[in-house]
Amino acid sequence: MEIPLSRYQSIRLDEIRDSSSNPKVLTFPRKFSLRGRRWKNPFGRLSCSSVVQGLKPKPKLKPEPIRIEVKESKDQILDDTQISKSGVTICSQIEKLVLCNRFREAFELFEILEIRCSFKVGVSTYDALVEACIRLKSIRCVKRVYGFMMSNGFEPEQYMMNRILLMHVKCGMIIDARRLFDEIPERNLYSYYSIISGFVNFGNYVEAFELFKMMWEELSDCETHTFAVMLRASAGLGSIYVGKQLHVCALKLGVVDNTFVSCGLIDMYSKCGDIEDARCAFECMPEKTTVAWNNVIAGYALHGYSEEALCLLYDMRDSGVSIDQFTLSIMIRISTKLAKLELTKQAHASLIRNGFESEIVANTALVDFYSKWGRVDTARYVFDKLPRKNIISWNALMGGYANHGRGTDAVKLFEKMIAANVAPNHVTFLAVLSACAYSGLSEQGWEIFLSMSEVHGIKPRAMHYACMIELLGRDGLLDEAIAFIRRAPLKTTVNMWAALLNACRMQENLELGRVVAEKLYGMGPEKLGNYVVMYNMYNSMGKTAEAAGVLETLESKGLSMMPACTWVEVGDQTHSFLSGDRFDSYNETVKRQIYQKVDELMEEISEYGYSEEEQHLLPDVDEKEEERVGRYHSEKLAIAYGLVNTPEWNPLQITQNHRICKNCHKVVEFISLVTGREMVVRDASRFHHFKEGKCSCGGYW
């Protein structure tokens, strides 16, 4: 019998009808015999919707033949007019389609096999269909293929049993995979590797170790890839004790020099916090691969050894080992920690030079860096160039808009993400709600907050409530903010009360601020930032005695306020400044130049209407010290140095380790107006973009 293949090439199974016949539902047996052992079907009763609904081929006016170019094979694939429409031909076409990575077209032909159950299908065709399921990661396809195998009485050999097991693992059907694994009569190392790697990938590390123990008892052997997977499980558990036991086993079996095992050891020790042993495992490798370099560099960066990680990165470059997108993403993360914009520009150039401009991992790291370091427009450019975007990419850019006070852009990006059918998560809502809070977008903020549970089925967490409290505080609705905290259907957290305390500071509500501060002090652990907010509140309102009391409390608790420090990057060098004249690393000529520039700026902005506010320091500070420290805050010194040493057309960016004080915020607004320079200040709270005398924060931070 001949089957018109061209009719089915682009027709979905559910679109095929036949009004002349209406066959009954086909049911497949739950078990079939396999070498004397029963192979259980985890899916039970399966049916084909086309058989249920009947069959009716839908002809096409201009059928297009299948044309496939296979370089590896000299056999030509013939069109519909040249081939005999037999089951063997269909199977051959399916195998060649899979070989050419045309998996969906292969399943369109597979529908014909499902309809004509009389066709005999060989092992190679089943193997091709399994490969298509793995590549598509489609649970529906897995059920169809596995059900078809059972209905045709297919009895797989060990190779195909392992392939079927791998198909279930790769498609996320881990429970069914375990059931199939238990039914395999003769399990080998590959069987164990497939199921163990599946449980590790799903984060079920305890089950993975149980299977590893079972494998050792049954086979008394272990494959090197399985060792590497188990080291990853140890890292997931955070158990260096278990990891060291695996290390000893690898030494006894003589597989410790294997590349996969060595890289697994480096990764395990790094993630468990033992960076010295990670470095030792790295140095013991006979041949250091790109993955090994990436693992050890990432380990140093993960534990805060950014300078050492950067040195290793240069060593990797000098060793001649090729870099990949993961190397560049690590390089960008190190740049973020060290605030080195020039280093990131080098990484960006390397991405383009090495052909990684479309790779999602490194480019998402770029979006994150540019967002965090004041280059949000550049971040958007990189984001738009990405051919594929994951949820991390969307969240990184949205968070960048939030930190830079561009709430409207963040909301538009959120709407665009929803329109693109990308499901938001908790981080997404935190980013967009923070953007609304920073920009004072009350209406949009409340609409998005309510949509979390009502539309997207995501229960708001404490951090989302903190954003809404900040939004209420920005509008001066402090009583409503307290009521909102009390009505929250979850345990109140430090972040929620801290948002209210900051609102009290900005609204200068000292009485409520004291109450909230006492609440925070009793919640523990002690958080220095809350004391700093109270200190600033007292200080800005002239309550010097109360401010001194806050410092005494800090001292009694063993806490201390770090001195205000500001950094500015000029070229590839980072320059730091403390308030007053405490920057001994500069010679007297540079110091005089900086002071002179500050004095000139203060004089210029005074002509534009700026008047110096009275500075309130502690009672034991004399007037001269008060005047000197107040006039030469670290922000002003850094700006003066940057203005002198950078081109006029470049935006000036500085970084502060505290919240920028009210007076300095006002000064920078006037300086941006007088000099015509765009200035970006990153303080402990957020980014402040100063342009033409205005700040992106709108006076609320």
From Swiss-Prot:
One of its GO terms (biological process) is RNA modification. One of its GO terms (molecular function) is RNA binding. Residues 496-571 are annotated as: Type E motif. Residues 607-701 are annotated as: Type DYW motif. Keywords: Chloroplast, Plastid, Repeat, Transit peptide. Residues 1-47 form a transit peptide. Its main location: plastid. InterPro entries: DYW_dom, E_motif, Pentatricopeptide_rpt, PPR_At4g14850-like_plant, TPR-like_helical_dom_sf. GO terms for cellular component: chloroplast. Residues 572-606 are annotated as: Type E(+) motif. It is found in: Plastid, Chloroplast. It comes from the Eukaryota. PPR repeats lie at residues 86-116, 122-156, 157-187, 188-218, 223-257, 258-288, 289-323, 324-358, 359-389, 390-424, 425-460, 461-491. NCBIfam families: PPR. Belongs to the PPR family. PCMP-H subfamily. This is Pentatricopeptide repeat-containing protein At5g50390, chloroplastic. It comes from Arabidopsis thaliana (Mouse-ear cress).
